[in-house]
Regions:
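Transmembrane beta-barrel wall of Gram-negative outer-membrane proteins
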Residues: 171-201, 209-252
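Extracellular loop and loop/strand-boundary signature of outer-membrane beta-barrel proteins
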Residues: 110, 164-168, 212-218, 255-256
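Extracytoplasmic beta-strand/coil segments of soluble accessory domains associated
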Residues: 33, 67-104, 124
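Outer-membrane beta-barrel pore domains and translocons
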Residues: 35, 131, 161-167, 196-200, ...
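Transmembrane beta-barrel architecture of outer-membrane proteins
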Residues: 65, 113, 140-142, 163, ...
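A beta-strand signature from Gram-negative outer-membrane beta-barrel systems
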Residues: 118-161
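Short acidic/polar hinge/loop motifs at secondary-structure boundaries
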Residues: 103-130, 230
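N-terminal periplasmic "start-of-domain" segments of outer-membrane beta-barrel proteins
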Residues: 27-61
Length: 256
């Protein structure tokens, strides 16, 4: 399957944007934006979790896929078997909505590819709100997952990530991963540009026989993923901020 996603998300916010406290020891200081009204966790009436990017990165570097990381870190969430699709994913038996920077990914086609829309390298943190909400339309009786992307900072920074995984069963069973990002800015403007690529090998059983692809759900075997993302932030004044997020995402499997 060949999938391409373009995401253009200009945000003009007329309210003060508090800084997300990535290393806050007290959850009361963490600000949640998924409810379209910036509030701390302590002020939220619904059960809320904020998963920091550092936790996600540790799980991904351990060889887990993104949706398996969510199942590990979010209480009550149930995901389907390994593959691109998140068909059947629910929170305590009810449907959920997936967003990137507040933009809803679930479409009327319900193609179950919402979690195959961003590389974990570009995730700052994830906000999870449990329970029904009407802010983003239908299909969110179980809650919502808002993926917040990394933004540029004033200090110049370069990030590089290399990784791999193999089962030592076959020359084609290894995964390869490389990602890089550069960011920087001034007191009034900042930006970040990143490229992340991952190649998935095949799966083999104990007899070194290849496991057959699940064509109905599009498994990750023999596929590659490319995520190119650019973000920019302009501080208009103390109370207004302009953000631009643009993304090219491609997830494609080989013909096996």
């Amino acid at each position: 399957m060949n999938k391409r996603l373009w995401l253009l998300n200009p945000l003009l916010l007329a309210t003060t944007l508090p800084t997300f406290t990535a290393l806050a020891a007290d959850d009361d200081n963490i600000v949640v934006s998924a409810n379209r009204n910036h509030r701390t966790v302590a002020d939220m009436a619904q059960t809320t979790w904020v998963i920091e990017g550092q936790e996600i990165e540790q799980q991904v570097q351990g060889g887990k896929e993104f949706k398996d990381v969510l199942a590990q870190l979010i209480p009550g969430i149930d995901v389907s078997s390994q593959g691109r699709t998140n068909y059947g994913m629910n929170m305590r038996g009810r449907a959920i909505v997936v967003l990137i920077d507040g933009v809803r990914l679930n479409s009327s086609r319900t193609d179950s590819r919402q979690l195959d829309a961003i590389d974990p390298f570009n995730i700052e943190h994830i906000e999870v709100i449990s329970g029904a909400t009407s802010l983003y339309g239908g299909g969110s009786t179980g809650g919502l997952i808002n993926i917040v992307t990394k933004k540029g900072q004033q200090d110049r920074q370069v990030d590089l990530e290399l990784g791999g995984k193999t089962g030592f069963a076959n020359s084609n069973d290894h995964d390869e991963r490389v990602a890089a990002a550069v960011s920087g800015g001034t007191d009034h403007a900042s930006g970040r540009l990143s490229v992340a690529y991952q190649r998935f090998g095949g799966w083999y059983d104990g007899n070194n026989d290849a496991l057959i692809l699940d064509n109905t759900q599009t498994g990750l075997q023999h596929s590659d993923r490319l995520d190119v993302m650019g973000t920019g932030t302009i501080e208009i004044d103390e109370q207004r901020q302009l953000q631009l997020v643009t993304q090219y995402y491609k997830s494609q499997g080989d013909d096996y």
